[in-house]
Amino acid sequence: MVKQLIKVAEDPMVGRYVAANVDLAAWQVALVERPLIRGPSQVTGPVCLGCLKSITAESAVMCERCGWPMCSDSKCADDEWHKAECDWTVLRRKQKVEIKDFTNPHPSYQSITVIRCLYQKHNNPEVWAKLTKLESHCASRRGGSKYEADRVWIADYLLRFFKLDPAEWPVEEILRVCGIVQVNGHEVPLTDPPYVAIYDTGSMLEHSCVPNCSKTFTRDGHLLIRTAAAAIDSGGHLSISYTDVLWGTAQRLAHLADTKFFVCKCPRCSDPTELGTYFSGVKCTTE
């Protein structure tokens, strides 16, 4: 039997994390993972709900079942990811969707990725179980402007637009899924505009502003995690950066607090000199 390169472990301080199960060499591929869910970004103009590429009023072809606009590739209407909103439109709304504005961010698309998560509850319990184990930070989000916006534009919208039974689909459950998407979603720059994907093991990689791994994506949207320039010993934690490593500490901390709801205490953030780089230093122009 081939020993797995990585494993998921748990720690009282950091929760679940990914560790090396063997010694990993520098630049070694440690993980290639298919997404649990993929869908459009929350703020986006109309996109094809199959390939997730931008579409216009002239290029759009309406799905014959549900009316959601797709691109001209006939395979996109049968795409596995499109099935969620297509089924909900046909079976619950019982009326085709009509999208008329193709020039601005469209509110109907804010809920698509959340729908694709909720759809798993009754249609793929295994994926639903994995999704609901992911962190949502609902306690930290509750009461904030983004949380209340999600209540109005996603939770209330879904209940009204798709005629959902609140007993079957509680508002708090929908808002929890919104949090799971926000906290665990990876921006995938393979399309214009980029889309969002949620991965199982990939969501458990911890953050560091001096990460020992990098992430990229394969052409088909699989997450690829590769070690950085240094080897990782067996048992060592694998980390990626959730923010832009080319930002200074203040900007990184603000971004992480706003989007991931934690205060980073990695070696770089804990050192006023940013490990001797003085990356956030202000250069005096006076001699």
Tell what function each PLM region has.
Residues K3, M13, W81, P194, ...:
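Residue-level signal for pocket-adjacent positions within structured domains
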Residues P12, D78, K146:
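Catalytic cores of large soluble enzymes that bind and process phosphate-bearing ligands
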Residues G15-Y17, V29, G144:
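Glycine-centered flexibility motif
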Residues V97-L223, T227, D258-T259, K265-R268:
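Catalytic cores of histone-lysine modification enzymes
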